């Protein structure tokens, strides 16, 4: 009986001794060893409002070899530069018993994953593609470790194909993940393996980012801004998008003749030969007897002169310049006349004379004055009083002619009246018998006192005794005078 009692006492003691660490281990699993991962996304707060100073750890934890496997089942997973991750882990407790503990894990998609404490359990956690500031705190009984990362946006690489990746510019943290589930041998501790970037305040030009996809790796280099200044977000296409855009791009090879254009200048003529072209209906094509035109040899000046004269009949090489643009025809001894430009060099004097003829049109167009040296507009050069002066002169001449005509008429009438009055007075004096000089009076009127018979044409004497003075002879006159005396 004694050995039996002693053996039972030893067994009870061993059971008590074994039950005490198991209880403490269970409590540790519930409090210390349980890993709780909560992801809280805040889309309203900007990244610059988060703290940017780092607090060093107050305690040193022994390294625990832990492998993490993450997968992104949601292809439309969004990124948030303001998301915060809080991780509680126990780095000192190792599971030695087969007790089971349930660890609630909250992912970005809102799913809760329960993991057991056995060695055969598998934990799969959906990670967001962009990690924000991470606050990791371990809560053992005597240790208090708090780590705060800078609030600058972080950049990571994910192994989720067919998923566009967007990241924020700034300092970066690289997280390598693969889509596989990992089982822990003795514990269910979850750790975030983070590579902290440079301290706040440092700036770089470009930071290479490695984007890992199954089978294809594409390096992407993005410029970084200083941490102090707020940086926007930039969309970085994945390797699949890069491959698609590269395959759709094809280089454009310029097709057509590669003959370089050449230019010749000779005096007032300028010829430009363009590359050879194909003939069509809208081109003026000239067939040539020689194929040396626009083939490197100088052009025929006579040919150019004819073309320029056809464009302008009054073309003068001394005053005008002619520019021609020709192009040879492919597989043919012909050229196409593409353009003929005649440039006329006019002197300022010639332009002034042309504008003077159109001064009224220029005035309507808004031109007020024009001058060339001392010459001005046509109205300034002309006498404004010339027309009224001419009219005045013509009127005065007409008036003078009219006055002269009136004076001549009046003077003639007056002279005629005087003659008639004198004759009337003489006749009245003769009739009254008053003779100042009787001899003169008798001599003046001999025909009145002469009496002679008039002989008719037949020789007969007429009854008339008055004979005209012209028919009297000198002898008759003498006889009359003697008789009168």
From Swiss-Prot:
Keyword presence, Membrane: yes
Polar residues bias spans: 26-57, 110-128, 135-149, 163-176, 186-228, 235-253
Cytoplasm found in the keyword field: no
Main location per the UniProt record: membrane
Region (Disordered): 22-267
Domain of life: Eukaryota
InterPro entries named among the record's database cross-references: CD34/Podocalyxin (IPR013836), PODXL (IPR017403)
Keywords: Cell adhesion, Cell membrane, Cell projection, Glycoprotein, Membrane, Phosphoprotein, Signal, Transmembrane, Transmembrane helix
Residues the record lists as Phosphoserine modifications: 464
Post-translational modification: N- and O-linked glycosylated. Sialoglycoprotein.
Name the UniProt record assigns to this protein: Podocalyxin
UniProt source species: Rattus norvegicus (Rat)
Lineage start: Eukaryota, Metazoa, Chordata, Craniata, Vertebrata
Chain's gene name: Podxl
């Amino acid at each position: 009986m004694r050995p039996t009692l002693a053996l039972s006492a030893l067994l009870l003691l061993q059971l008590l001794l074994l039950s005490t660490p198991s209880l403490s281990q269970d409590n540790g699993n519930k409090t210390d060893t349980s890993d709780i991962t909560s992801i809280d996304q805040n889309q309203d707060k900007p990244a610059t409002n988060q703290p940017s100073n780092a607090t060093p750890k107050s305690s040193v934890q022994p390294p625990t070899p832990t492998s993490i496997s993450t997968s992104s089942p949601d292809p439309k997973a969004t990124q948030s530069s303001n998301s915060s991750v809080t991780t509680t882990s126990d780095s000192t407790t190792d599971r030695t018993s087969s007790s089971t503990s349930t660890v609630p894990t909250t992912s970005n998609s809102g799913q809760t994953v329960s993991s057991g404490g056995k060695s055969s359990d598998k934990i799969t956690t959906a990670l967001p593609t962009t990690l924000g500031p991470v606050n990791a705190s371990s809560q053992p009984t005597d240790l208090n470790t708090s780590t705060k990362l800078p609030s600058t946006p972080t950049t990571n690489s994910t192994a989720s194909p067919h998923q566009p990746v967007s990241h924020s510019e700034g300092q970066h943290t690289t997280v390598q993940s693969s889509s596989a589930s990992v089982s822990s041998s003795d514990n269910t501790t979850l750790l975030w393996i983070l590579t902290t970037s440079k301290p706040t305040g440092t700036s770089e030009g470009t930071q290479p980012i490695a984007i890992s996809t199954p089978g294809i790796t594409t390096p992407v280099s993005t410029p970084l801004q200083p941490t102090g200044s707020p940086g926007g977000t930039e969309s970085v296409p994945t390797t699949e998008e890069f491959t698609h855009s590269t395959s759709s791009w094809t280089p454009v090879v310029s097709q057509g003749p590669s003959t370089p254009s050449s230019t010749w200048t000779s005096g007032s003529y300028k010829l430009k030969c363009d590359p050879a072209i194909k003939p069509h209906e809208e081109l003026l094509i000239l067939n040539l007897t020689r194929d040396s035109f626009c083939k490197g040899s100088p052009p025929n000046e006579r040919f150019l002169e004819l073309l320029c004269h056809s464009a302008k009949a009054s073309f003068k090489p001394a005053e005008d310049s002619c520019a021609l643009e020709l192009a040879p025809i492919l597989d043919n001894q012909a050229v196409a006349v593409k353009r003929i430009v005649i440039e006329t060099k006019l002197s300022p004097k010639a332009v002034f004379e042309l504008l003077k003829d159109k001064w009224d049109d220029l005035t309507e167009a808004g031109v007020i004055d024009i001058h060339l040296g001392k010459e001005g507009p046509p109205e300034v050069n002309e006498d404004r009083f010339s027309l009224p002066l001419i009219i005045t002169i013509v009127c005065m001449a007409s008036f003078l002619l009219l006055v002269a005509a009136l004076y001549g008429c009046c003077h003639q009438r007056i002279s005629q009246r005087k003659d008639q009055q004198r004759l009337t007075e003489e006749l009245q004096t003769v009739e009254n018998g008053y003779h100042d000089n009787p001899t003169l009076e008798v001599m003046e009127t001999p025909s009145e006192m002469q009496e002679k018979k008039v002989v008719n044409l037949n020789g007969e004497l007429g009854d008339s005794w008055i004979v005209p003075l012209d028919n009297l002879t000198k002898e008759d006159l003498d006889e009359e005078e003697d008789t009168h005396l």
